[in-house]
Amino acid sequence: MNYIPTQTFYGRRWRPRPAFRPWRVPMQPAPPMVIPELQTPIVQAQQMQQLISAVSALTTKQNGKAPKKPKKKPQKAKAKKNEQQKKNENKKPPPKQKNLAKKKKPGKRERMCMKIENDCIFEVKLDGKVTGYACLVGDKVMKPAHVKGVIDNPDLAKLTYKKSSKYDLECAQIPVHMKSDASKYTHEKPEGHYNWHHGAVQYSGGRFTIPTGAGKPGDSGRPIFDNKGRVVAIVLGGANEGARTALSVVTWTKDMVTRYTPEGTEEWSAALMMCVLANVTFPCSEPACAPCCYEKQPEQTLRMLEDNVDRPGYYDLLEATMTCNNSARHRRSVTEHFNVYKATKPYLAYCADCGDGQFCYSPVAIEKIRDEASDGMIKIQVAAQIGINKRGTHEHNKIRYIVGHYMKEANRDSLQVHTSGVCAIRGTMGHFIVAYCPPGDELKVQFQDAESHTQACKVQYKHDPAPVGREKFTVRPHFGIEVPCTTYQLTTAPTEEEIDMHTPPDIPDITLLSQQSGDVKITAGGKTIRYNCTCGSGNVGTTSSDKTINSCKIAQCHAAVTNHDKWQYTSSFVPRADQLPRKGKVHVPFPLTNSTCRVPLARAPGVTYGKRELTVKLHPDHPTLLTYRSLGADPRPYEEWIDRYVERTIPVTEDGIEYRWGNNPPVRLWAQLTTEGKPHGWPHEIILYYYGLYPAATIAAVSAAGLAVVLSLLASCYMFATARRKCLTPYALTPGAVVPVTLGVLCCAPRAHAASFAESMAYLWDENQTLFWLELATPLAAIIILVCCLKNLLCCCQPLSFLVLVSLGTPVVKSYEHTATIPNVVGFPYKAHIERNGFSPMTLQLEVLGTSLEPTLNLEYITCEYKTVVPPPYIKCCGASECRSMERPDYQCQVYTGVYPFMWGGAYCFCDTENTQLSEAYVDRSDVCKHDHAAAYKAHTAAMKATIRISYGNLNQTTTAFVNGEHTVTVGGSRFTFGPISTAWTPFDNKIVVYKNDVYNQDFPPYGSGQPGRFGDVQSRTVESKDLYANTALKLSRPSSGTVHVPYTQTPSGFKYWIKERGTSLNDKAPFGCVIKTNPVRAENCAVGNIPVSMDIPDSAFTRVIDAPAVTNLECQVAVCTHSSDFGGIATLTFKTDKPGKCAVHSHSNVATIQEAAVDIKTDGKITLHFSTASASPAFMVSVCSAKTTCMAACEPPKDHIVPYGASHNNQVFPDMSGTAMTWVQRVAGGLGGLTLAAVAALILVTCVTMRR
């Protein structure tokens, strides 16, 4: 069975049925076996009569002069009405209609959906109860599979349905005669609001959500419509997420059915809940009348509730017994949430400090203080009940409390809560108070009782709320931003949280006994008294009237008031009545919910940009967090809380930095290669230029060059001196010898002893012609050698442009080579020039727009704050008790003998030393765990997904692909395969912890091995699973003498300790600029590695040569060039062309990156290109269509030290040499080389001459 409906012509939506014509038979109930055509004259007569009556009434109304009087509204004539309906018009409507008239008028969206639903949905009933709905969509009828029952339509009920457990649907073909009632459907779901039976449905991020309370069990199967009346989804259930509920739905995409099930989803089938009474089952919402009402039979009703406390329908039974299941009496209002409190009562409990440093039994004893809300609100539980008067009914400005055995009330206005100052009370209900309090080390609750006495209780409690966001503010700002937080929702409606109530114990009261002439009189005073006297026999029992015990003393009697027709909270300061406790449950108001909190925005810092550094001037109004990190391989994270004016200098590199001040968004900046001097000036300017860029390398290079010059000069001078000495030594040793003219000139010999040049040459011609020719050729040889050396030096230095030799870029894609390697850097454009025979060259541009590295996670457990559950102690008077086994986490049980507890009315037991107390305690998840918990995962192989923009020809399209070397995407007819990435790197360790939106690399303990006070002391698979493990070092202690309580010691929560000491999250210290996100856990835009690409581009993507412009005489002239800046170069290309058109433009060198991929060729023969380079003297080849030319430029350094964008070119890994610098180097090297060569030649020549002698 295909679960995608077929769109057909019969999809008429939210239009009323067409009016019946007189010549057609109305669809009305008719006796069987009646031919419709025979009724046509009767129907025509009826409708004609209706028309005449309506016209007459309208005419009378228009012509009447008398004032208007109240009249019954004329009902619209409908073809469906028959004679039987007309007879019943004047009858008195039944009471049910009267009640329905009081219902709230549905809103516009509800009315719209009711019109649509009128035809296309049908109730599903089980035993006469509606459990859900079936919907007609397209050509199919669909019903949720979990909804039990039969469709309330005979034609649909007999169909054969095919069930799908994957989609939780049952589906069948619609009968032909019902196709006109079906609804259209659509797979188009733009984000916004949609409609359903209970109002608006918000669709955002692929999730349908509604306000909590708008949907309930029984709504399963209801459709969600768009504004055109088309079905976009079918509701299956919902997951309570606090203020909103996420819907579980079945919906459609373009070609398939999908099911979305949020975590914690509950199916919304209205299953019939059954309860039990004396082994007889009955519907929980309809209890048997023995008992069925608390007001009639309170004690029996409480016992029945206690028997069913663990059944799913307990709260239905509780509501039915509190309202007595009488719809005439039960009115829905805000006071209905207080109905359950008439079955409960406040109590007196032990308080160690009643405000004056002394203990007492306080009516406002503090039971618990909860501070899970991140906005600083606390919830306090006390013994008194607020918002209820002494009669047990709701009264907002009253406080109900206990004095002795009697109920009293006081004004709520006198209620106060203190820490270091007065707290602001935000809400009260029952035993609970929610308030905002200033930080402090203690908490006190007090009120003025009916006698104007102060009733108070004070406990030690350290209140120091953690800041919301990154600023520690004390006053909520008028302006700021909204950040996620948790708070106690100010609602008294029933919630998922609950507290246990139990039957109170017998309260001892020595004032009930009085001594009268050797007898003891028990004064009942309208109460039931349980007494026990040891004087005589048979003086044990209960009485509701005054009773006298003869021949007895007060010391020999014990009396206690017994009352089991009300519950009270299961306080650990009040003993329980039975060893096996009988309990009930009531909802807790003010649930913890996810919300948003307005936090301030710190003043924008004053920013001063320097050379590779950033100075920020910070003016905090309150302690504010400053953090920054590098975006390179070494993040070097830094954080500091700042509470006064300071200046901080942040180093900025070419890799970039990210800093964040307070709650302001993070700022990313990159350094540019700015410097002083000029790369194309005089030597001192060039040296200053390079010293600003590479100070160490410049110092080393200049020092080496200077040393080379000095050594070259010294060597040349030494060689010249040696040659002169060798030249003149023979003549100096020979008496009367004359130095030849040539040697005299070369060796600077005195002329007085030398012959003339002609004489010397004549002498050599006569005596040694070989030496004559050597003497003549020596200067010429020296000149030739020098010229050759200079020529070779120039030829060697000419190609030593370091920018061409070194680059981080990737090789250019050649013709027919459909592979490339693109850098995994977001926003960095990669271009390839592709040539193909018979086609004009094409430029392919690939740009990574975003990457996502998502690891495979295995949830080990979740951990959160725990709560210690301490049941009321069981005190066995004059006897012994034993511990029982209980499957509870960290369960502890101890029996203490020889206790003698007291309550406010006297000793709880009659015996002195034979009494025992059974104390119990165990650990459970705190109620805040649903909102505040950490998840421990094991991370495995990460899968990388990239979003890449592909541009070639006229195509510019974005695609998303897995970078694994296997996933292939098709873009414009071309096939691309990306990956695998060159570097198998991930920022996640093998073990990670996810807390809210932060991720931490942490080696957590395995499941079942948690240690007290450490991360993982409480572990469970989910926030609701039953496999809770706890190790909190819980130990019970012996109770103090005379006091009813359960003392214990325990290690503080390891989760709360971890929250304070968890350190910097991976979000703030991930290398390579990774952005860490959750849901799911992933690292986005990590700039590491390269992505190989395989391409298969068809010929249709190219332009044929005959269709492309023919470009000739291409020349390049660079007008402006700023290196190391984002497209800071402008080049003008001139050319000749035969026709206008479009040509691909590409740089064949990695020295420069051209911004344009294609240009429009015009007949004027001139185009302008923008390029980016890191070279001071770039020389790169540019091609336009099939023509090529070389662009050469002299670039200046950028003026801005720091910019908010990264470079769009390949950076240099070796100091670059400008053309001017190379010219100066060549000149210096040529001069020194020539001098050195001359010295070498002279030395060689003189040596040769002297050796021949």
Curated annotation (Swiss-Prot):
Topological region Cytoplasmic: 716-754, 791-792, 1249-1253
Segments on the Extracellular face: 333-694, 755-769, 814-1227
Sites of S-palmitoyl cysteine lipidation: 727, 747-748, 1248
Region (Interaction with spike glycoprotein E2): 162-167
Gene Ontology CC entries for this record: host cell cytoplasm; host cell nucleus; host cell plasma membrane; membrane; T=4 icosahedral viral capsid; virion membrane
Bilayer-crossing regions: 695-715, 770-790, 793-813, 1228-1248
Cited Pfam families: Alpha_E1_glycop, Alpha_E2_glycop, Alpha_E3_glycop, Peptidase_S3
GO molecular function, one term: RNA binding
Keyword Amino-acid biosynthesis: no
Known glycosylation sites: 279, 532, 594, 956, 1085
Ranges of biased composition (kind: Basic residues): 66-79, 93-108
Sequence motif Nuclear export signal, residues: 151-161
Swiss-Prot/TrEMBL site (Cleavage) positions: 268-269, 332-333, 754-755, 815-816
The reaction(s) this protein catalyses: Autocatalytic release of the core protein from the N-terminus of the togavirus structural polyprotein by hydrolysis of a -Trp-|-Ser- bond
Record region (Functions as an uncleaved signal peptide for the precursor of protein E3/E2): 269-280
Residues covered by region (Ribosome-binding): 106-120
Location of the region described as Disordered in the Swiss-Prot/TrEMBL record: 58-109
Chain positions covered by the region annotation Binding to the viral RNA: 90-121
Residue ranges, annotated region (E1 fusion peptide loop): 899-916
PROSITE patterns per UniProt: ALPHAVIRUS_CP
BP terms from Gene Ontology: fusion of virus membrane with host endosome membrane; proteolysis; symbiont entry into host cell; symbiont-mediated suppression of host toll-like receptor signaling pathway; virion attachment to host cell
Miscellaneous comment in the UniProt entry for this protein: Belongs to the Old World alphaviruses that usually cause fever, maculopapular rash, arthralgia and myalgia. Structural polyprotein: Translated from a subgenomic RNA synthesized during togavirus replication.
Entry remark concerning the domains of this protein: Structural polyprotein: As soon as the capsid protein has been autocleaved, an internal uncleaved signal peptide directs the remaining polyprotein to the endoplasmic reticulum.
Protein name as annotated: Structural polyprotein
Source organism of this protein record: Sagiyama virus (SAGV)
Lineage: Viruses, Riboviria, Orthornavirae, Kitrinoviricota, Alsuviricetes
